Amino acid sequence: MTDWPLAQTFRFNGHSVRFAVRGDGPPLVFVHGTPFSSYVWHRIAPYFITTHRVHYFDLLGYGQSDKIEGDVSLGVQNELLARLLEHWGLDCPDVVAHDFGGATVLRAHLLNGKDYRSLTLIDPVALTPWGSPFVQHVRQHEAAFSGLPDYIQRAIVPAYIRGAIKRDIPDDELAPYVQPWLGDPGQAAFYRQIAQMDERYTREAEGLYPTIRCPVQILWGEDDQWIPIERGRALQGMIPGAQFHAIANAGHLVQEDAPEAIVAALLRFLPFFS
């Protein structure tokens, strides 16, 4: 993904995590989900570099960060985020998170004590139960999937990711999402992160949602086929004062279906805390 450079490296538990910091102004942190990378913000983050100091990174085991054989679960990603916030010297940034990134920022806030000035959650993994039939099957057969022939992997990954996007995305636009999961290290990493999915990591934080200490807005694609919009409305009911905005004509990966809706929501929300 040469068009999405992450030029800086943070060492976490002996492994390399790639990140970028751009712009000047109040700190704004973007956190991606699975099976994606910080590339999901490529149509959104650049818009804010004239008004904010924008931070984004690839989770451990994802994108341009090290694809380790060890723990890349939700149980470690909040520890990584907490350490990164300290490395960046951020005490109370605005935070935007999608999918597993939502679980990560919620855990860092509620379990690691990290404070945010505001929090925007986009189709987050936050309420149990979660996990598609494909995820459940892979969890039971990780070794078999990790050893699939390359041509089958090249069919599975695009089909899986397309399920998160409502529009008919061209192959060249899909490629940056697919490429990190190809080849021996990438294929093993793809099934490793699925095999390590465990609902206990969301259960550990779920009961604490009423104690969230910052303003929250929740954005949800109306046509999300991975996590139904009803889960988003249920999440809103657990967080006092949370705003909820349904995004029309968008699936789970709202960043690809309706990036302008995310930008507009942030432009409405963030100035209240400037």
Each model region followed by its residue ranges:
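Active-site loop/oxyanion-hole signature of alpha/beta-hydrolase fold enzymes
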Residues: 13, 55-97, 264-267
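Conserved HGGG/HGGXW glycine-rich cap/lid loop of the alpha/beta-hydrolase fold
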Residues: 21-64
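Conserved alpha/beta-hydrolase catalytic His-Asp/Glu region
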Residues: 130-132, 150-211
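Short alpha-helix in the alpha/beta-hydrolase fold that links the catalytic acid
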Residues: 173, 205, 228-237
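Short beta-strand/loop motif that positions the catalytic acidic residue
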Residues: 212, 218-220
